[in-house]
Amino acid sequence: MLAGLIIAAYPFISNYLYERRQQDIITSYETQQKTDTETNEELENVKEYNKSLAAANVTVTDPFDPEGLSGFGRREYETLLNVNEEGMMGYLEIPVIDVRLGIYHGTGENVLKNGVGHLKNTSLPIGGEGTHAVLSAHAGLPEKKLFTDLELMKEGDIFYIHVFGETLAYETDRITVIEPHNTEDLKIQEGKDYVTLVTCTPYGINSHRLLVRGKRIPFVEKETDKEIEKRKGSQWMRQYLYGAAAGIFIIFLFVGIYKIIRIRRI
């Protein structure tokens, strides 16, 4: 019975430990910020990179396509916004679905299993006119929630990018579902400052991509957690609660049958 309860509780325990680890990584990132001079120099380099990227009109690929991992200015790309030398650019915060995850270079499988990946050939996430950063993560993993609750977001929801000591605010202005090869909505648009969050959908099938796009808005001090109404109805939570309940029911059923058999044998 104990083993069954442990198995049923595994997703919740695993996700809790993962989120604690992410918080430690974010705290470490915030303490490793560069000096003002270094930051200004780095940001200028990133702005130049983003300008060159926009001018090059490069091809944007599906974040989950292993064949599309090559990127514009690859060597330079890996060194930019690499504060802790571990590929972490900054972190993403989505208050309404209680997400705080590190953002890393690239969308390789190792990145997507452990955090949010920045899609190569899209703008680095420092904001500015004529930029469009694309951030992706998995949904539906049994041991981590990641972007599973992205489907709960609505137009008007605000999310934040924390990078180099600054907080950039984005208001969700468009939510769409596309086929994986249709990446037109991920391209840079002149004069616009966008960030698009991407994950697989529908839950458990993953045949399409869910895009949650945010437009840049002025940052104002965030509400406290108590004032923010968290979005409810998580499929991740619902699925594993059902699984846990079913597991516990089966355990008690077998225990009950076992006791009945023993009594009849006496």
Where are these regions (language model features)?
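Solvent-exposed, non-transmembrane regions of membrane-associated and secreted proteins
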Residues: 1-237
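C-terminal single-pass membrane-anchor helix
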Residues: 227-266
